Regions:
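Extracellular, repeat-based ectodomains that mediate carbohydrate processing or recognition
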Residues: 1-192
Length: 192
């Protein structure tokens, strides 16, 4: 990056909150933390995911969204919700990866859809195929084999609850790989 183009607004966020607005159930911090991947075969195609409050007016505190550009970032498609659960459970902290041949995307996130109390956490994912400028998502699926609790009290100064700030995903031509925090063995968990 010797030079950069003019600033472009890809999406306008409603924001799920930061340290001063612990929006997710359990007092968990949740920044939008967008992630972007570039097509390895077409530099004009970029794909972005982030979490945000529900786009339409709702009480849903956090969903995962996707947008793409086919002109190098000058314009972006309208946001599409990636998680398909119908409830108001939290979905946040997405990661994204693209295959080296540029034909597949993987999006994954923390998800509470399996807990009616909106507390226990799982990791879900959704694969997509890319054909030209068209991205087609498949069905979302559970990745974790067991749910896990929120952990509190790790940072008594700024915020007591963190989850997933540094998660990542990568891909090769046959598989997707994802890291996540998993608290199922923790002794400092709580139920809300």
């Amino acid at each position: 990056g010797v030079t950069f183009s003019a600033q472009v607004t890809a999406q306008t966020l409603r924001t799920t909150g930061t340290n001063g607005d612990l929006a997710l159930n359990g007092g968990m911090r949740s920044n939008a933390f967008p992630q972007v991947v570039a097509s390895p075969t077409d530099a004009n195609q970029l794909y972005m995911v982030w979490n945000d409050k529900g786009i339409s007016p709702s009480t849903d505190k956090s969903n995962v969204y996707f947008s793409q550009t086919t002109d190098g970032g000058t314009t972006w498609s309208p946001a599409v919700q990636v998680n398909t659960d119908a409830g108001l459970q939290d979905n946040w902290q997405p990661v994204i990866a693209i295959t080296p041949d540029g034909t597949g995307l993987f999006v994954s996130w923390y998800d509470r859809r399996l807990d009616g109390a909106n507390s226990r956490i799982n990791v879900f994912g959704r694969n997509a195929t890319i054909s030209g400028s068209t991205v087609t998502f498949g069905t979302d699926y559970r990745i974790t084999d067991a749910d896990f609790p929120v952990v509190i009290g790790q940072d008594g100064v700024i915020v007591s609850t963190y989850m997933g700030d540094y998660d990542q995903a990568v891909a090769d031509n046959t598989s997707y790989y994802r890291t996540w925090g998993d608290n199922r063995l923790s002794s400092t968990a709580h139920t809300n």
